[in-house]
From Swiss-Prot:
The gene is hemH. It is found in: Cytoplasm. This is Ferrochelatase. Pathway: Porphyrin-containing compound metabolism; protoheme biosynthesis; protoheme from protoporphyrin-IX: step 1/1. Its EC number is 4.98.1.1.
Length: 354
């Protein structure tokens, strides 16, 4: 194996600490070519699609990418912001806010972000840390619930980059925070603040709150992936924090891909059924997405909305993701600080932003 070039070793090195926030990724532009390039990388990950690659790559290159590239590009174009992809824009803002929070509390750390697919990639971010003298790295996935297809593959990419380093940094990983009190508090605050501005559903009249998580094949649950259970755990804690019953608040799963059975109940059919059953208002919130993206803005805000209204529903509300909410930035700072304990950060734990 050839190792990456290293800066000269020095006892006067910076000995810095780096915090890397990791999200899924996004195309560089809402064009068919950029989307196909992104999907090719994403769907070629064996952690994402567990089909023998010799068979899968033929299907991917000859059928899926040509068909989905243009259709997906139109969807991305519908949600694209002036600054770029929503996921990248919100992740950059979160990174800036966490950096400011930690710095203002005396933390001597670097904070950056990377995407598992697309750019900026994890290998590049770790190389940037190394050039800045970082010798300790905390990998902080922006996935509250652990899954092999998200968290594990992010760690795979980081460890692949480390495998090419002669002089590796010390590394810690945040596996999940599905039940972290600060995360649950931030979710509850996001819902409460939305209701304060737009009115609370009339649960006594049958209105519903739906907590929609990204789906994964049911087979992964049977094989031991904890994602389903952690989504249910988050859902139960948030339901309790809001003072709701399991009749008033339901957990569902979205973004099914292919014909295999995925985790159920599925989000879109559930909303359609609610409309047909006479539910007048449905609010949908996506606790597993820490930043708004195609799956929340377009899939939930447009496709799922249309299903509910077509079923007879009258009022549909998509509650925005955590994005840059102060309670969420404070929770991120708290989770990061807990996982930096024992490293020379030169300051106390940051306070929660109010």
């Amino acid at each position: 194996m050839r190792f990456d070039l290293e800066p000269p070793s020095s006892t006067a090195a910076a000995h810095r600490i780096g915090v890397l926030l990791i999200n899924l990724g996004t195309p560089d532009a809402p064009t068919p070519r950029a989307v196909r390039r992104y999907l090719a990388e994403f769907l070629s990950d064996p952690r994402v699609v567990e089909i023998p690659q010799a068979v899968w790559q033929v299907l991917l290159r000859t059928l899926i990418l040509p068909l989905r590239g243009r259709a997906s590009a139109k969807k991305y174009a519908a949600v694209w912001m002036p600054e770029g992809s929503p996921l990248r824009v919100y992740t950059e803002r979160q990174t800036d806010s966490v950096r400011h929070l930690l710095t203002s509390n005396g933390y001597h750390v670097m904070v950056d972000y990377a995407m598992r697919y697309g750019s900026p990639n994890i290998s590049h971010a770790l190389a940037q840390f190394k050039r800045a003298g970082v010798e300790r790295v905390l990998l902080m996935p922006m996935y509250p619930q652990y899954s092999a297809s998200t968290t594990a593959t992010a760690f795979d990419a980081a460890f692949d980059a480390l495998a090419r380093m002669r002089n590796q940094p010390e590394v810690r990983t945040v596996r999940h925070y599905a039940d972290h009190p600060a995360y649950i508090h931030a979710l509850a605050e996001q819902v409460r603040q939305y209701w304060a501005q737009h009115g609370r559903p009339d649960f006594a009249a049958g209105d519903k709150l739906v907590l929609s998580f990204h789906g994964v094949p049911k087979r992964t649950l049977d094989l031991g992936d904890p994602y389903h259970d952690q989504c249910q755990q988050t859902g139960a804690l948030l339901t309790a924090a809001l003072g709701l019953s399991t009749t008033e608040c339901r957990v569902t799963f979205q973004s099914r891909f292919g014909k295999a059975e995925w985790l159920q109940p599925y989000t879109a059919p559930t909303l359609r059924e609610f409309g047909e059953a006479g539910v007048r208002r449905a609010d949908v919130f996506c606790p597993g997405f820490t930043a708004d993206c195609l799956e929340t803005i377009e899939e939930i805000g447009m496709e799922v909305r249309d299903e509910f209204l077509a079923g007879g529903g009258k009022a549909f509300h998509r509650i925005p993701c955590l994005n840059g909410a102060p309670a969420w930035i404070g929770a991120l700072g708290e989770i990061v600080a807990e996982n930096l304990q024992g490293w020379p950060v030169r300051a106390a734990q940051p306070e929660t932003v109010s």
